[in-house]
Each structure stands twice: as structure tokens, then as C-alpha cells.
């Protein structure tokens, strides 16, 4: 498995609604038609109005390589080029293990409890979604979550990314992506008031279904090489 994470910073934040609207059919097409695509979300960051958060999950290198040659990829890139970016940071991550965040109790676990071996210094990505039973609750929930998201990003050591955002393709869905430096930073987050406050906010809704997984990654590198070509292989190993 390969994960791509990115943050796009728009040159003009007022253009974000237009960008998200134009990206929606391209996201749906990628999810529906490209083999090996397990997640593909470009969503508005509720805590920073100029940013779009990106999370992709691909089955293997072949499926990601095929995506980089697909019209969906080129159309998405052209659209954001027309909208205008002030900056973009994108990484791909090689996944070595994955499992649910919660054990059977259910309790959030930072260690990989289903694995015999632990790699406590490897980065961990937490990703998934929350489907609200009442989609009309999503907008207010995300607005209320913005200060909690910023507090987690700014105050918790080892937090590289922490975004709960509106999936443009599903009106009931909140997309989740977090990046933590290692086991210790994620473990501390699960004992932090930010984690409990976010959980209480989500549980204040009338009902929800969720799916959260954590992914252990042993390698990350830029998506683009020095020639600005998107690479599905891990070229820094060459």
C-alpha cells in the first residue's frame, strides 16, 4: 500500500469553494473507475480557509503509477493550476502494517496490537471517516471542531497533520487524516484533552458510523522528483 498526503495552499482563499466544487466529480471518477484506489479525498480544511487537505490510499505501486498516467490525475492538476496555488507540499508513504485504531474493548491503541513486531520510531498515519446519520449536522460540527484541530496541530509534539474535513462527494461524511511522528506522539495524543474533547464533540451528534485505521510507514519522500515528475516508485532509494 502507498499513501499520499498533501496540503494545497490557494493563492486566493475565496476561490476554495470553486476549487472544491470542480474537484468533486474528478474525485468521484477516480474512486469509481481507477483500480486499486481505496481512498481519494481533496477536502477543505475547516481550520484554515486557504488550505485543501489531500489523502489518497493506493493498493500498490502499479495502481498509483497507472493513476499518474490517467486523465483524472491530469484534469485535477490542470484545475488547481487554473485556480492558482501559493504553495503545495505532497508526500508519499510506504505502508508496512495497518490495523484498526480501536481494539475490541474498544480503546484507541497507538501500538500495533495485531502485529508481533513493533517499530516505535516509524511514523503513523491515522485515516478514515465518520458518517453522520444526519448530514445537516456536519457543517456546525466541523466549525466547532476548528479550534480543537488547531490546538492539536500547534500544541501536540509530533503532530504533522490533523484534519477532520467535509468529504465533497458524500454529504454525510467527515474525512479524517492524521500524521504522527512515531508511537510515542500518537500514544500521548490518545491521552490528551484535545483527543477527548474532539471525541465528545463527535459523540454529541444524533448518530454516526465510523471507520478508522492506522498505518505504519517506514519510508516517505516527495511525490515529485527533481524534474517535477510524479513518481509511484520510491526513487530516493536508488
Task: Annotate each language-model stretch with its function.
Residues 2-9, 41-68, 124-131, 163-192:
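Short, well-ordered beta-strand segments in beta-rich or mixed alpha/beta enzyme
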Residues 14-17, 23, 43, 63, ...:
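Ser/Thr/Pro-rich low-complexity tandem-repeat tracts
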Residues 136-138, 143-154, 159-160, 164-167:
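A contiguous binding-surface segment within folded domains or other stable secondary-structure elements
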Residues 1-11, 15, 99, 221, ...:
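Hydrophobic, helix-prone linear segments
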Residues 17, 21, 117-120:
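Short, low-complexity N-terminal intrinsically disordered segments enriched in polar/charged residues
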Residues 9-19, 131-141:
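Short, surface-exposed ligand-recognition loops at beta-strand->loop->(often short) alpha-helix junctions
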Residues 41-47, 76-122, 163-172, 197-238:
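Glycine-rich beta-strand-turn "strand-cap" elements at beta-sheet edges
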Residues 24-37, 57-94, 151-160, 179-216:
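An amphipathic, aromatic/His-enriched active-site/gating alpha helix that lines ligand/cofactor pockets
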Amino acid at each position: 500500500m502507498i499513501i499520499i498526503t498533501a496540503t494545497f495552499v490557494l493563492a486566493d482563499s475565496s476561490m476554495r469553494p470553486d476549487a472544491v466544487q470542480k474537484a468533486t466529480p474528478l474525485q468521484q471518477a477516480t474512486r469509481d473507475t481507477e483500480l486499486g484506489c481505496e481512498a481519494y479525498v481533496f477536502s477543505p480544511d475547516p481550520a484554515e480557509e486557504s488550505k485543501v487537505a489531500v489523502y489518497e490510499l493506493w493498493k500498490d505501486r502499479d495502481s498509483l503509477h497507472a493513476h499518474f498516467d490517467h486523465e483524472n490525475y491530469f484534469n485535477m492538476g490542470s484545475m488547481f493550476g487554473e485556480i492558482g496555488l501559493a504553495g503545495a507540499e505532497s508526500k508519499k508513504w510506504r505502508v508496512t502494517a495497518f490495523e484498526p485504531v480501536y481494539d475490541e474493548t474498544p480503546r484507541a491503541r497507538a501500538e500495533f496490537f495485531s502485529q508481533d513486531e513493533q517499530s516505535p520510531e516509524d511514523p503513523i498515519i491515522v485515516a478514515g471517516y465518520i458518517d453522520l446519520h444526519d448530514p445537516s449536522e456536519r457543517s456546525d460540527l466541523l466549525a466547532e471542531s476548528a479550534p480543537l484541530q488547531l490546538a492539536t496541530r500547534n500544541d501536540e509534539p509530533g503532530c504533522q497533520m490533523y484534519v477532520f474535513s467535509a468529504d465533497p462527494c458524500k454529504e454525510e461524511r467527515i474525512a479524517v487524516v492524521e500524521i504522527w511522528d512515531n508511537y510515542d506522539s500518537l500514544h500521548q495524543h490518545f491521552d490528551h484533552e484535545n483527543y477527548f474533547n474532539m471525541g465528545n464533540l463527535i459523540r454529541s451528534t444524533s448518530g454516526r458510523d465510523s471507520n478508522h485505521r492506522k498505518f505504519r510507514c517506514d519510508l516517505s519522500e516527495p511525490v515529485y522528483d527533481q524534474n517535477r515528475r510524479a513518481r509511484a516508485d520510491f526513487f530516493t532509494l536508488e
